[in-house]
């Protein structure tokens, strides 16, 4: 199995004047292609910091990070931004859709060149993805007219637009009611199983973690548990 994530000795230290806070303390982590993993831990455990480093939003203080075999922790800011846009997909607790853009335009947005328009091929891809997430009847609806669950499904389609190596989901169900959350989780399961998409999901919800094939537990900046469950996400 190809490793999508390979992190070695990841540390992160934040400085505030003379004060030094060690948030991550030597994280070693691999995530294989096609895995669906949940990352859990109490507030302050380092989950969000590790997710930001893997998502190339923060640089580690020490350690190395490779994604799909490519070393990324030492890339320039310009190359990090390019890699992030082209090779990673993101789903957040709050969908961050453009309210006046249609569902199709929101999905296609990551593929559009800065200052450029949306090509016919991009529109076709976006429509196909919206159909994939069950929103073929909402393609031309402005995002502001969609329900919370529908908006999060648009966000998942958007994350898939550039065929990313890895989809990073930060509390993707945290702003949804239970029924909508279950539908979003079911959709992630389908995309993971049928398309082989690799997911890393950060969550406080034990119900979400229990349905994933792997559970990573962080405590006080360390990876304290790494459990695989082949029956997860049933």
Swiss-Prot record:
SUPFAM superfamilies to which the protein is assigned, alphabetical: P-loop containing nucleoside triphosphate hydrolases
Residues annotated for ATP binding in this entry: 41-48
Taxonomic source organism: Caulobacter vibrioides (strain ATCC 19089 / CIP 103742 / CB 15)
One cellular-component annotation, GO: plasma membrane
Keywords, ordered alphabetically: ATP-binding, Cell inner membrane, Cell membrane, Membrane, Nucleotide-binding, Translocase, Transport
Enzyme Commission number(s): 7.6.2.-
UniProt xrefs under Gene3D superfamilies: P-loop containing nucleotide triphosphate hydrolases
Subunit-structure text: The complex is composed of two ATP-binding proteins (LolD) and two transmembrane proteins (LolC and LolE).
The protein's name in its UniProt record: Lipoprotein-releasing system ATP-binding protein LolD 1
């Amino acid at each position: 199995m190809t490793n999508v994530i390979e992190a070695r000795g990841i540390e992160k230290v934040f400085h505030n004047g003379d004060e030094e806070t060690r948030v991550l303390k030597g994280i070693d982590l691999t995530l294989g292609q096609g895995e669906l993993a949940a990352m859990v831990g109490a507030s302050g455990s380092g989950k969000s910091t590790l997710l930001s480093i893997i998502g190339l939003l923060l640089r580690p203080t020490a350690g190395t990070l490779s994604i799909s075999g490519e070393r990324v922790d030492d890339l320039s800011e310009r190359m990090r931004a390019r890699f992030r846009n082209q090779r990673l997909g993101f789903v957040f607790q709050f969908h961050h859709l453009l309210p006046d853009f249609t569902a199709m335009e929101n999905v296609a947005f990551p593929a559009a060149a800065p200052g450029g328009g949306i090509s016919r091929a991009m529109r076709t891809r976006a429509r196909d993805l919206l159909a994939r997430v069950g929103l073929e009847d909402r393609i031309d609806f402005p995002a502001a007219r969609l329900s919370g669950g529908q908006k999060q499904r648009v966000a998942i389609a958007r994350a898939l637009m550039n065929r990313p190596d890895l989809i990073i989901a930060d509390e993707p169900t945290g702003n949804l009611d239970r029924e909508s959350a279950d539908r979003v989780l079911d959709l992630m399961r389908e995309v993971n199983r049928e398309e082989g998409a690799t997911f890393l999901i950060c969550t406080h919800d034990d119900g979400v973690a229990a349905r994933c094939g792997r559970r990573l537990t962080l405590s006080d900046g360390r990876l304290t548990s790494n459990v695989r469950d082949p029956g997860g996400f049933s």
